[in-house]
A protein has these predicted regions:
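Active-site beta-strand/loop signature of hydrolases that rely on acidic residues for catalysis
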Residues: 29, 129-131, 212, 243
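Surface-exposed beta-strand/loop patches in extracellular or lumenal glycoproteins
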Residues: 213-225
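Aromatic/acidic polysaccharide-binding cleft in carbohydrate-active enzymes
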Residues: 40-45, 86-93, 98-108, 114-153
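Solvent-exposed beta-hairpin/edge-strand motifs
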Residues: 223-234
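Glycan-recognition and catalytic regions of carbohydrate-active enzymes
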Residues: 127-128, 135-138, 142-207
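Beta-sheet entry/capping signal
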Residues: 16, 23-25, 87-89, 123-126, ...
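C-terminal beta-strand-rich structural cap/linker in extracellular carbohydrate-active enzymes
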Residues: 236-252
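Active-site-proximal helices and loops of the catalytic beta/alpha 8
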Residues: 1-83, 116, 135-163, 216
Length: 252
């Protein structure tokens, strides 16, 4: 835990390691608000446990609606400078917390959390075993070894991770684009947002993402659906199925 050592040490540590390797990237394990460690003289990034906490309430425990989830995510983004937000290590799991899959009621909810993680500003962190749905509440459970002998690279969850990572690598807008909320009504569990990026020619590239955490099909606003469907599960005739998602490249 980086906060258990004083700031003077980390400033000296940064100076020492940068003298050896100028482009080294330092990530600190900080569980609380990390602004004081991210002033450019200590760490370049921190493990974003707030990201996990808010995702846990929306996708896992389902105690937050879309409005609250968006409000907390907005507060988290506004807390730091833009370059810091885009460098934060966004995690669902780590070596110190119960497996996120165990906190979700079903695999479908976990899948939506993964889609959100891979399309949110920052650096998505995949802890070993996330891609195969490892579970565990207690320390001896969530730190269990990787089940190499039973690893199924054709499982739906493994393929979801592969496709989400491939899409993020391919689409610069998902890595560098701005973030804008589209749907986040209080009392609703349907969340929609947009990643958009101005290109060199002045045009705007945009990908809209919709996640339905409701237990029933919901209609999406027609004006938000125009464009090329990049990836979808459960989108049909303007209706998004329960626990479905859609990624749409918006028309210019």
């Amino acid at each position: 835990m980086a906060n258990e050592i004083n700031h003077e040490f980390w400033r000296a540590f940064r100076h020492a390691v940068r003298a050896v390797k100028e482009d080294i990237f330092l990530i600190g394990e900080i569980w609380e608000e990390a602004g004081i460690w991210l002033q450019g003289d200590q760490f370049d990034s921190t493990m974003n446990y707030d990201f996990r906490k808010h995702c846990r309430r929306f996708f896992g425990e389902q105690t937050a609606d879309a409005g609250e989830f968006d409000s907390r995510m907005t507060d988290m983004r506004m807390r730091y400078r833009k370059q810091t937000v885009y460098a934060q290590l966004n995690l669902l799991d780590s070596h110190d917390v119960s497996r996120f899959r165990s906190l979700c009621r079903d695999e479908e909810s976990f899948r939506l959390a993964v889609i959100f993680q891979m399309t949110f500003p920052g650096m998505p962190s995949v802890f070993y075993g996330d891609e195969v749905g490892l579970t565990g509440i207690l320390e001896e459970e969530y730190r269990q070894p990787m089940p190499w002998d039973t690893l199924d690279e054709s499982s739906p969850l493994f393929l979801l991770y592969q496709k989400a990572i491939t899409l993020r690598k391919k689409e610069a807008v998902l890595r560098r684009g701005e973030y804008r909320t589209l749907l986040a009504e209080p009392g609703s569990r349907v969340y929609g947002y947009e990643r958009y990026l101005e290109k060199e020619d002045g045009s705007i590239e945009s990908i809209r993402i919709f996640l339905n955490m409701e237990e029933e099909n919901v209609p999406l606003p027609e004006e938000l659906l125009g464009g090329e469907i990049l990836w979808q599960e459960g989108l049909k005739e303007g209706q998004l199925a329960a626990k479905g998602f859609a990624l749409i490249r918006a028309r210019d």
